[in-house]
Amino acid sequence: MNSSELVTRTIRFQNPERLPYDFPEKYGSDFYSTGLSPSPDDRPRNGGYDEWGAFWQTFGFSNLGEVKEYPLKDWKDFDHLSVPDIHAPQRWQGIEGARERAGDKFILAGGISIYERVHFIRGLENTWMDIYQNPEELGRLVDILVEMNLVAIQKYAAAGADGYIFCDDWGLQNRLMVAPKSWRALWKPRYARIFQAAHAAGLFTFLHSCGYIVDI
């Protein structure tokens, strides 16, 4: 049973010979990771502006950083937001030949967050207020990210990917960041579009989310 079969059987609860694992390359892995590069979800490693116009400051050894200047402070500037071109050919050069390089490993392709990226653009407090005060505008912004994911899914499927993963941290230590009702109204239908498109293209879907998310 090869790596791809192990992962697939694990996802489907079909009694794999062992659990698949994902360690640094020198220790071995059943997964092969790929993704568009540069990604609209990238953060500048040493601080500075990202493709959306958000200004990042990094601290210490971590390259995660935090946004210090948000590009969309006022919804009246929405039409002037710098939106990365998801179709730019250079983004997709890295996935060419991924199937051949991966061998029998399970190819896991990286997507674009539809919550974290929103608050990187608007600010976290603004995003929370938008849920109640500007839901239509907020929905328009989330939809831009959804459409990017739909494009990525087709590109990855054509390149032979097996799974699609992206990250949105929804949880605090003991509760969600937003009310479950609001999450179901604004984000759940949009996640459904992404997952349905991925499944239709033959990809498994994975959503990483830190924190307490039991309520959804």
Model-derived regions, located:
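Helix-coil boundary/capping segments in enzymes
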Residues: 17, 27-95, 102
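Active-site loop segments of alpha/beta catalytic cores
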Residues: 1-26, 80-216
